[in-house]
Structures are given as structure tokens and as C-alpha cells.
């Protein structure tokens, strides 16, 4: 996920040379706010023709790490011809309002059967439920650690990858969600190595369970 954020952030900065990358948070709703989640719903409603497209992946994220500013919405979807594409929407910062061209979806997946994809819609995003998930995850933060940001939120329908081995044991049509949360250890946010200082934080991944509760899955130490 960190590599994806860096790639998208770089493209945003290149596309807006007159502005500083440090201004990506201009007018940005906070990732953990109802406003941010509702903006995702409204962006999908406004920009996607659900008669012609079925979305199988929705991801929204911050760009500047630890700032907690909603910046980008990324979708992957299939058209009636079975061709898969991705598209990026810039929701805040200097590139606010930019919509990327359709890009062919990468990976092994080349085509999908449009009729067999159920499709994610704005109704797949429940603002109240997601707020409760964030609250539950924050309650799991250990003592002496501080919440900094929601890194990203992903909703994904399980679709064929194009590789039988990778697709074994998958339940096609199943919808899963997960999100990452960034936290810092109090008093240990800045570390120094070889005379260079860097920010140290932990990226914690949470899976959303079928009953709507969350489960901590993975913790990664990151330096920036």
C-alpha cells in the first residue's frame, strides 16, 4: 500500500508543478471523518455509470503519510466488453477535481465476465459502519501509542485473477474490506541513524469481519 501511495503522490506533484507537494492537505477532509467517507460515496455517484461499468475494487487513501487527509480515490472496474480498467480521482490538494484517464488494469487479470461480476456501488459504502470500525480499531491502540492517520480503506469483490493456482479456495463474488491505521510510539517518533533523522511509525492493518467488527492482522514498522 505504501508503494501505491508514493506512486500516486508523485504523479499528483508532477501534474501540478506550480504547487508544493506540502499543500496536498488543502481543504482535505480527515480520513477518519464521516465527511471523507461520504465524499467517496458522492464521487462514485457522480462519475461512474453503473449501467456500463461494474466496480470490483474501491480504495481511498491519504497521500502525505501521517497527515490523515483524504486525497485520492482509486477504482478498478470492468465494462460490458469484459475489459478491466482503473481510474483515479483527486479529491483534495492542488490537483483537486482531477480525474485520470482510464488505464488498463495491471496484473494477470485481462478480462472478466461482466455478467458474473456483482459489482460494488455507492451503497456498498456505509458511512456509519465505517465510523464504528475506525472507533473500534482506535480502541485497540496500545497504551503509550498515538493515532496519527488512516492510511487507506479498501473494499474489494473477489473476482478471478486469471491464474487458476492463485484462484484456488477463493469464493468469487465475496466482498471483503480492510484498512490501515498509522500510529506512533510516544517519545519515539523521531529516530536517528548514521547522523540522519527520520520519522518512525507503525502501519497496522485491520480486516473487517462479516459481522462488521474489525480484527488486527498485521503491524509494520516504517521510517520516512
Which sequence ranges carry the predicted segments?
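Short glycine-rich, low-complexity/disordered patches
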Residues: 28-30, 34, 38, 42-68, ...
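Exposed beta-strand-loop-beta-strand "reactive/processing" segments of non-cytosolic proteins
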Residues: 52-88, 159-200, 204-205
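Positively charged n-region of N-terminal signal peptides that target proteins for export
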Residues: 1-4
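Contiguous hydrophobic, core-forming segments of folded domains
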Residues: 75-111
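Conserved small/polar residues in nucleotide/adenosyl-binding loops
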Residues: 222-224
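C-terminal motif of bacterial Sec signal peptides marking the signal peptidase cleavage site
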Residues: 17-20
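Bacterial signal peptide processing site
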Residues: 22-24
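Long, charged/polar, surface-exposed segments that mediate recognition or autoinhibition
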Residues: 102-153
Amino acid at each position: 500500500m505504501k508503494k501505491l501511495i508514493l506512486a500516486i503522490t508523485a504523479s499528483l506533484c508532477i501534474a501540478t508543478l506550480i504547487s508544493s507537494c506540502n499543500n496536498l492537505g488543502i481543504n482535505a477532509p480527515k480520513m477518519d471523518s464521516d465527511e471523507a467517507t461520504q465524499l467517496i460515496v458522492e464521487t462514485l455517484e457522480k462519475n461512474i455509470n453503473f449501467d456500463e461499468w461494474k466496480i470490483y475494487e474501491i480504495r481511498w487513501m491519504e497521500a502525505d503519510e501521517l497527515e490523515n487527509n483524504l486525497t485520492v480515490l482509486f477504482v478498478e472496474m470492468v465494462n460490458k466488453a469484459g475489459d478491466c480498467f482503473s481510474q483515479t480521482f483527486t479529491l483534495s490538494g492542488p490537483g483537486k477535481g482531477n480525474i485520470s484517464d482510464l488505464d488498463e488494469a495491471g496484473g494477470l487479470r485481462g478480462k472478466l465476465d461482466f455478467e458474473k461480476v456483482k459489482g460494488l456501488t455507492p451503497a456498498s459504502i456505509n458511512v456509519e459502519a465505517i465510523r464504528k470500525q475506525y472507533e473500534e480499531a482506535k480502541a485497540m491502540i496500545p497504551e503509550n501509542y498515538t493515532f496519527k492517520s488512516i492510511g487507506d480503506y479498501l473494499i474489494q469483490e473477489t473476482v478471478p485473477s486469471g491464474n487458476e493456482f492463485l484462484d484456488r479456495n477463493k469464493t468469487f463474488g465475496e466482498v471483503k474490506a480492510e484498512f490501515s491505521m498509522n500510529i506512533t510510539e510516544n517519545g519515539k517518533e523521531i529516530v536517528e541513524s548514521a547522523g540522519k533523522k527520520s520519522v518512525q511509525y507503525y502501519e497496522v492493518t485491520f480486516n473487517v469481519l462479516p459481522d462488521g467488527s474489525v480484527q488486527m492482522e498485521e503491524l509494520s514498522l516504517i521510517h520516512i
